[in-house]
């Protein structure tokens, strides 16, 4: 198992990824509202909204919550006006981090992000310095006991997936953004349950951290960023050194 996968496994076990159901619903509702405002409330003609609603259903978000979020976006209900922001950051050990944000007040969020970074040895990067190290990809993660490796390869690659990784009892399916919806639909049609399913920034290469204290700072920094209410997602090129033993 690679260090990047080792880190992902630790995060799943700790429940660090959107651990609270309320946090999941809040983040998805923001995405739905922004998508509806940008492209209208008709899912058929608005791919971004369609993907957000699919994600909401996968998270078992109540139908009323979904409809309310759409109405807020289209102006049918009063709601916050959100601004999309992307923060490019550095963490200790030369690790690069991308932070996706939807905020109703950037003047509040930016100092909060800076504070989280500064307290754990991180900093904001210049525009483009970090984003060039990542690619935008669809990523679907599912437990390997649901389907054989051969069957998944046939199904996912046939639907347009680019790559499939097998790590620690999990499959990670990667797609281009344009093929993400088709691949997700193909997997769902076979009754497969996704642990995670989203379009996110994937690192082209990783930075291995072999010093325990530095690794712990990076992990804490990422967790603190994810805990911020305005943060939609965090991606990094962090790779935990194979010899690093955490408490």
Swiss-Prot record:
Pfam families: TACO1_YebC_N, Transcrip_reg. The keyword Ligase does not apply. InterPro entries: Integrase-like_N, TACO1_YebC-like_2nd/3rd_dom, TACO1_YebC_N, Transcrip_reg_TACO1-like, Transcrip_reg_TACO1-like_dom3, YebC-like. One of its GO terms (biological process) is regulation of DNA-templated transcription. One of its GO terms (molecular function) is DNA binding. Keywords: Cytoplasm, DNA-binding, Transcription, Transcription regulation. SUPFAM superfamilies: YebC-like. It is found in: Cytoplasm. It comes from the Bacteria. Its main location: cytoplasm. GO terms for cellular component: cytosol. Belongs to the TACO1 family. HAMAP family: Transcrip_reg_TACO1. This is Probable transcriptional regulatory protein LEPBI_I0056. It comes from Leptospira biflexa serovar Patoc (strain Patoc 1 / ATCC 23582 / Paris). The lineage of its organism: Bacteria, Pseudomonadati, Spirochaetota, Spirochaetia, Leptospirales.
